[in-house]
């Protein structure tokens, strides 16, 4: 599902100038060679919500009435953070990028705030009605828990190899965007700069051994 949404995201916003299947093939190759990714984890649900959030953030680009787009973007960030609480940290980056996309106003900021809190309102109602308040407190406790910085010994070899490969791909791709960015439209350059910032932001939680995706499979 995540691979399909990545394809649609690229086709909808024209992030890559030339239509090709290489980037999709690489993604599916990475999934294939990682046995632990063949099961459905809570982090997979969070990843899909994350992609929906990016979609609506991109839709808000230079929109005069962007409150609705930011509401839905932060709604999915909030929903995903219930499964992976550290997604909440991306709210700061989302607000910064919304400002760069010229879509952040007081009204859209309020829409974003309401969107993020709505999943927690629903979670609170469920937890209160069934007397399971620990379910509501759990994401906030996870959010405030950090592991050791740069303690990579807890990672398995295939995890280190995957992270290293992704980092090399990021360096090459980011360098290409900087060198050949003048060939893209202004909107596309803004999207690509967002993806570069997002990738740098993603490597921050990787530095903390505790901030890994939930490892309890659903199936």
Segments (PLM) and residue ranges:
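Juxtamembrane membrane-water interface segments that cap and precede transmembrane helices
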Residues: 138-160
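Membrane-embedded helix bundles of polyisoprenyl
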Residues: 20-35, 44-52, 73
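Membrane-interface alpha helices of multi-pass inner-membrane proteins
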Residues: 69-85
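Membrane-interface helix-loop-helix junctions at transmembrane boundaries of multi-pass membrane enzymes
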Residues: 174-201
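Membrane-interface transmembrane helices that cradle and orient dolichyl/undecaprenyl
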Residues: 53-68
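Perimembrane helix-loop-helix junctions
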Residues: 90-114
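Transmembrane-helix motifs of polytopic, lipid-linked glycan transferases
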Residues: 2-13
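Single conserved hydrophobic/aromatic residue that forms the stacking wall/gate
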Residues: 210-219
């Amino acid at each position: 599902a995540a691979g399909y949404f990545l394809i649609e995201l690229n086709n909808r916003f024209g992030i890559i100038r030339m239509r090709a299947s290489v980037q999709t093939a690489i993604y599916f190759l990475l999934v294939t060679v990682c046995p632990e990714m063949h099961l459905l984890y809570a982090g997979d649900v969070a990843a899909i919500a994350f992609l929906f959030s990016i979609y609506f953030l991109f839709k808000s680009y230079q929109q005069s009435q962007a409150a609705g787009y930011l509401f839905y973007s932060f709604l999915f960030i909030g929903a995903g953070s219930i499964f992976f609480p550290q997604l909440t940290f991306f709210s700061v980056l989302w607000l910064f990028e919304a400002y760069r996309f010229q879509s952040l106003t007081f009204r859209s900021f309020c829409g974003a705030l309401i969107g993020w809190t709505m999943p927690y309102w629903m979670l609170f109602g469920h937890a209160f009605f069934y007397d399971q308040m620990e379910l509501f407190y759990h994401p906030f406790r996870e959010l405030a828990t950090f592991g050791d910085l740069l303690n990579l010994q807890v990672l398995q070899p295939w995890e280190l190899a995957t992270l290293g490969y992704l980092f090399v791909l990021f360096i090459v791709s980011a360098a290409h965007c900087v060198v050949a960015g003048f060939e893209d439209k202004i909107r596309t350059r803004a999207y690509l700069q967002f993806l570069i910032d997002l990738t740098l932001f993603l490597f921050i939680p990787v530095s903390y051994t505790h901030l890994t995706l939930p490892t309890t499979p659903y199936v």
